[in-house]
Regions:
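Substrate-binding pocket helix/loop in short-chain dehydrogenase/reductase
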Residues: 98-99, 103-108, 210
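C-terminal substrate-recognition "lid" of short-chain dehydrogenase/reductases
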Residues: 119, 218-247, 252
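Active-site loop immediately N-terminal to the catalytic Tyr-X3-Lys motif
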Residues: 97-100, 147-153, 175-176, 217, ...
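Conserved glycine-rich Rossmann-like NAD(P)H-binding loop of the short-chain dehydrogenase/reductase
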Residues: 28, 32-46
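Alpha-helical segment proximal to the catalytic Tyr-Lys
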Residues: 127, 171-175, 238
Length: 254
């Protein structure tokens, strides 16, 4: 079975590292016709520069928690490629604290990046997909959106909102041929996790703890997750919509 995205155009947020970067690479390798990579830095991050010679990819820098950024990445996709088939709402941020220790600014940062960004991207891209009578929206969810985890005071509620918005959008826009799904990730081997391990003071013990939390006995690679995002964006997944698909090594089954 060959998964192909030939002829399709995608917008991927949080594209400069971790899951997002792996998605960008796999979408390009899967024959996508055009891709707009979005991240916070105003200029293209070095992680993406090696891909910049591929004329199928364009970069937009900005805060996804603002309407202006969503407007700009939508316009970039339409200007260069004429359509948008796939939207990946992947940008996310976590403040690792109990709820009572979050400042109002930290709460807003998490909610704006993880939740409000989905409103802004949908506000601009959904009308295009509705006119096309087709489209796929994939949202990066989390085990924190399905079960309580200590120190996820804002992040957990934000991912719960991502999961519920996925269901809402799926029902609302199914008549227009638009599929909406979320991938509920467990712990993924990304630079963020590596930094957290270093900050813990005992990286080996920290990583061992993360692995032990997953019944499968390990954490996932960003490439594994990107492979599933590629399948879910393809026509092979045409009957999936409204699903929160847990890719968590058995974590949520405990």
């Amino acid at each position: 079975m060959q998964v192909t995205l030939a002829g399709k155009v995608a917008v991927v947020t949080g594209a400069a590292s971790g899951i997002g970067l792996a998605i960008v690479k796999q979408y390009l390798a899967s024959g996508i016709a055009g891709l707009v990579a979005v991240d916070l830095a105003p200029n293209m991050p070095t992680s993406l520069t090696e891909l910049s010679q591929d004329k199928r990819m364009h970069y937009v820098g900005g805060d996804v928690g603002t309407d202006d950024t969503a407007k700009r990445f939508t316009e970039t996709a339409i200007t260069h490629f004429g359509k948008i088939d796939i939207l990946v709402n992947n940008a996310g941020i976590n403040v690792v604290k109990p709820l009572h220790l979050h400042t109002p600014e930290e709460w807003d940062l998490v909610m704006n990046t993880n939740v409000k960004a989905m409103y802004f991207s949908g506000r601009h891209i959904l009308p295009i997909m509705m006119k096309q009578k087709s489209g796929v929206i994939l949202n990066t969810g989390s085990i924190s959106g399905e079960t309580g985890i200590p120190t996820q005071g804002a992040y957990g509620p934000s991912k719960g909102a991502v999961h519920e918005m996925t269901r809402q959008l799926a029902i609302e826009y199914a008549p227009y041929g638009i599929r909406v799904n979320a991938i509920g990730c467990g712990t993924i081997d990304t630079p963020l996790v590596t930094r957290s391990a270093i900050d813990s003071g005992n990286p080996q013990a920290f990583m061992a703890m993360l692995k032990d939390n997953h019944p499968i006995g390990r954490i996932a690679s960003a490439e594994e997750v990107a492979s599933f995002f590629t399948y879910m964006a393809s026509d092979l997944a045409s009957f999936f919509t409204g699903a929160v698909l847990m890719m968590d090594g058995g974590y949520s089954a405990k």
